[in-house]
Curated annotation (Swiss-Prot):
The lineage of its organism: Bacteria, Pseudomonadati, Pseudomonadota, Gammaproteobacteria, Enterobacterales. SUPFAM superfamilies: S-adenosyl-L-methionine-dependent methyltransferases. This is Ribosomal RNA large subunit methyltransferase F. One of its GO terms (cellular component) is cytoplasm. It is found in: Cytoplasm. Belongs to the methyltransferase superfamily. METTL16/RlmF family. Disulfide bonds: none annotated. One of its GO terms (biological process) is rRNA base methylation. GO terms for molecular function: 23S rRNA (adenine(1618)-N(6))-methyltransferase activity. Its EC number is 2.1.1.181. InterPro entries: METTL16/RlmF (IPR010286), rRNA_lsu_MeTfrase_F (IPR016909), SAM-dependent_MTases_sf (IPR029063). It comes from Pectobacterium atrosepticum (strain SCRI 1043 / ATCC BAA-672) (Erwinia carotovora subsp. atroseptica).
Length: 311
């Protein structure tokens, strides 16, 4: 008898990953996943999430099965993101845009992904789900090369996803948003940690949570610019807020994930200091994990509605 689907509580209603992974279907769609799928102690099929190659292959299977991404890979040592959580940000962002568009998610929206990474997952999902056009910024040339290889290897993506190199490691939006650009949304998954040591401690916590020895050579993946920056998440978002002032008439919504809820009060103060017209906090959840993104706009309600009507 087929087991009833168990939903991952909290995920967006349109998220294709609300149910537990359907490994029989994934294996059929992507046979390379077969060697990594084992029956766990609960009698369910799963993969070893402590094995980077298994996680990468699972991502390849998910991207092919749900989003028709036939060719996707990342270099060793780069961040391998969980697809369900990344998709949630995209869907909640779609709802935010719909609020100013008579409750209709705009097709062909133009979105800037700050720090798209080697994985380029937000543009891939956003384009496949909603037909959005993406500009991805990236400071790491190797990450940019890998992302571009994915774009070129999949039919039609190079007409809808473009990449721009951020040559100034201290800048976030400056140098990426050009004079004649306009974006319906900016999205960002900022570096979480404040130092390399902080990032190492984070990996040790993951090892502990997985029940593994701290001396295990496990590589969770992630380059310096993906995992940490001076001052961590709060400093990065603070700089993004300052940068956004210069582009307040070129972008409808600026958004950024915020991993630590305790950072919100300082973020709100920073947004008040730059006279943001509208600030929203969108809560998200995946099981026990709580997350959110903060959105701000320098346009009032009427101006935001006119923006989308003129698209």
């Amino acid at each position: 008898m087929t087991k009833p689907a168990v939903q991952k509580s909290g995920l967006h209603p349109r998220n294709r990953h609300r149910d537990r992974y359907d490994f029989p279907a994934l294996k059929q769609s992507y046979p390379a996943l077969i060697p990594f799928v084992k029956v766990n102690a609960y009698g369910d099929e799963s993969v070893d999430f402590a094995n980077p190659e298994a996680v990468k292959t699972l991502n390849q299977a998910l991207l092919q099965h749900f989003y028709q991404i036939e060719h996707w890979t990342i270099p060793d040592g780069f961040l391998c993101p969980p697809i369900p959580g990344r998709a949630d940000y995209v869907h909640h962002l779609a709802d935010l845009l719909a609020e100013d568009n008579r409750s209709v998610v705009p097709r062909d929206a133009s979105v800037l992904d700050v720090g798209c990474g080697a994985n380029c997952v937000y543009p891939l999902i956003g384009h496949r789900e909603y037909g959005w056009r993406f500009t991805g910024s990236e400071v790491n040339p190797l990450a940019m090369k890998a992302a571009n290889e994915t774009i070129e290897a999949n039919s039609g993506l190079n007409r809808s996803i473009r990449l721009r190199r951020q040559k100034n490691s201290k800048a976030i939006l400056a140098g990426i948003i050009h004079k004649n650009d306009s974006f319906d949304a900016v999205m960002c998954n900022p570096p979480f940690h404040a130092s390399a040591e902080d990032a190492r401690e984070g990996s040790q916590r993951k090892l502990h949570n997985l029940g593994l020895d701290k001396r295990s050579p496990l590589n969770f993946g992630g380059q310096q610019d993906e995992l940490w920056c001076e001052g961590g998440e709060l400093a990065f978002i603070g700089q993004m807020i300052k940068d956004s002032v210069s582009f307040g008439r070129q972008c409808l919504w600026f958004t950024s994930l915020v991993s630590r809820k305790e950072h919100l009060p300082e973020i709100y103060r920073a947004l008040e200091a730059v006279d943001a017209e509208k600030v929203r906090t969108i809560d998200m959840a995946q099981g026990q994990k709580q997350s959110r993104f903060v959105a701000w706009s320098f346009l009032d309600t009427a101006a935001r509605a006119r923006w989308l009507q003129k698209r």
